């Protein structure tokens, strides 16, 4: 069992590593729940850790009800169990009032179509939109989930969401490793976001998402560190592109309208991440919060960089060693 005190210590370590790697905001996909509905110990452990480290956080509180399509929870899943939807919303609304609004927000998670029925996912999407909260959901990370969803519902998980909930720029599908082209096209056209986690997806041998079609359609895709086995935003950025090179046998898949890989990947790690978490960050401009990362341009890994080549050298050849510090809310 994992209790609040060791959870807090683990979060402090994790969030500290995030800041050291240049990450200024964490969207914590949080589904360790509590002994009773009035117990906020696990939530507070995560929030207190973020406060101690000084990282901005959106606590994405997960609803988790089933152990699979038509199955009860069992074993280790029992700790993730959510009570009824009404109690869950009361918990979230109370937590939203208690958090430090300058650095902390609350969002929602419907864990997956296998852990939450589509009617409940629809209600969560509606409630999140009404509250101005971002909503995330695991989707099509592994082929088995798709096959079982088709057996249960006759359609893929993405098709189930496209037709079953109100998709908006406040809704993010995490992974989409094996999403069909037509389903992805509809999701992006409806305004939905995608979050990829290249290092975790590689670690778990999940597969590689088709970024080519997402880029071609101009979809909003962000990056997550997921399992945190290795925390490096520069590596996540790099492998978003490199994985495509390996599968498509071509370079420059993840590029902007001007053919720049660096500009595209930097936007993915900043502006797009901000949109997926519903935060006014991600760029240095009037009206945005002063969150940014300082890079040592004289580091040996960036030796010889010019204004024109710095971005590419950062994305292709640098690691956490070039990160000097992170500035969050000007501090």
Where are these regions (language model features)?
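Metal-associated gating/positioning segment near the N- to mid-region
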Residues: 1-42
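Histidine/acidic-residue-rich catalytic or RNA/ligand-binding cores of hydrolases
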Residues: 69, 143-155, 183-188, 205-214, ...
């Amino acid at each position: 069992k994992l209790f609040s005190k060791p959870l807090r210590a683990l979060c402090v370590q994790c969030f500290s590593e995030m800041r050291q790697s240049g990450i200024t905001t964490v969207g914590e996909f949080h589904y360790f729940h509590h002994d009773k509905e009035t117990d906020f110990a696990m939530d507070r452990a995560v929030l207190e850790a973020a406060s101690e480290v000084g990282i901005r956080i959106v606590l994405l509180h997960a609803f988790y009800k089933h152990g699979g399509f038509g199955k009860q929870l069992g074993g280790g899943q029992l700790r993730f169990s959510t009570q009824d939807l009404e109690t869950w919303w009361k918990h979230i609304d109370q937590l939203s009032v208690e958090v430090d609004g300058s650095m902390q927000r609350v969002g929602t998670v419907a864990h997956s179509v296998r852990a939450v029925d589509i009617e409940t996912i629809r209600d969560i999407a509606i409630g999140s939109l009404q509250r101005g909260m971002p909503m995330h959901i695991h989707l099509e990370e592994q082929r088995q989930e798709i096959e079982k969803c088709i057996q249960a519902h006759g359609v893929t998980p993405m098709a189930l969401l496209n037709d079953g909930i109100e998709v908006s720029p406040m809704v993010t599908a995490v992974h989409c490793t094996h999403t069909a082209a037509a389903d992805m096209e509809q999701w992006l056209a409806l305004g939905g976001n995608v979050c990829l986690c290249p290092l975790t997806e590689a670690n778990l041998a999940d597969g590689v998402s088709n970024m080519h079609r997402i880029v071609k359609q101009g979809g909003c895709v962000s990056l997550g560190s997921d399992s945190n086995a290795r925390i490096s935003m520069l590596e996540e950025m790099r492998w978003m592109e490199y994985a495509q090179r390996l599968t498509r046998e071509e370079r420059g898949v993840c590029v902007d309208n001007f053919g720049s890989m660096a500009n595209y990947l930097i936007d993915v790690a900043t502006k797009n991440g901000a949109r997926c978490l519903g935060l006014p960050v991600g760029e240095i401009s009037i009206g945005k919060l002063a969150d940014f990362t300082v890079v040592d341009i004289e580091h040996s890994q960036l030796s010889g960089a010019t204004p024109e080549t710095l971005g590419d050298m950062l994305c292709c050849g640098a690691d956490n060693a070039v990160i000097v510090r992170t500035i969050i809310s000007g501090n």
